[in-house]
Design a protein with these regions (language model features):
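Noncatalytic, solvent-exposed loop/strand surfaces
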Residues: 1-172
């Protein structure tokens, strides 16, 4: 082991009770895969935490997607893995549009997030609409870079996006 860090529990406090909770015994809130470009490594957790470290184990930045964009609206837990590509960090938040288990808000948007991997700051956010219903809106897939586009599967569709803006190029 070259280094070890405690990035946090991955859980978040229960509403009003001050205790951590887990919604599902099948999910640990640390189901997403870390991603690296050989210079840094980024971990994402089901509670919305994103944490980046350099290759020596020094924390570079930390942020929480739920704090920045509102409570997730997932049946189980958020577990999409981030993608590092061409000097940018991409993360899909493809969620349902109605509260579930008391979490989320009506008409919660699904979106793609592009961040600076060195700082964690948002470069762009692009809403991704779908006509799917309830749990069919949820996806935990990883964004795939392919031929100058970002491929995103979920919400009953496959879409191609411009990596510079997030704008949708095509939909199938």
């Amino acid at each position: 082991t070259l280094w070890e860090q405690n990035a946090g529990s991955g859980y978040r406090p229960g509403k009003g009770d001050g205790f951590d909770y887990q919604l599902d015994s099948k999910a640990t809130y640390a189901n997403a895969s870390p991603v690296t470009d050989g210079n840094l490594v980024v971990f994402s957790y089901g509670n919305g935490d994103l944490v980046a470290y350099d290759m020596g184990g020094k924390e570079l930045w930390r942020r929480n997607i739920q704090k920045d964009y509102g409570d997730f609206c997932f049946q189980w837990t958020f577990s999409a893995s981030a993608t590092l590509h061409a000097g940018k960090l991409y993360l899909p938040i493809l969620q349902r549009n109605e509260p579930v288990h008391g979490r989320g808000k009506p008409n919660a948007p699904s979106f793609l997030l592009c961040m600076n991997p060195q700082t964690g700051k948002t470069i762009w956010q692009h809403q991704r609409h779908s006509n799917a219903n309830k749990e069919s809106l949820e996806s935990f897939g990883t964004i795939i870079p392919h031929k100058g586009q970002l491929l995103v599967a979920g919400g009953d569709v496959l879409t191609g996006h411009d990596p510079a803006t997030g704008n949708e190029i095509w939909r199938w």
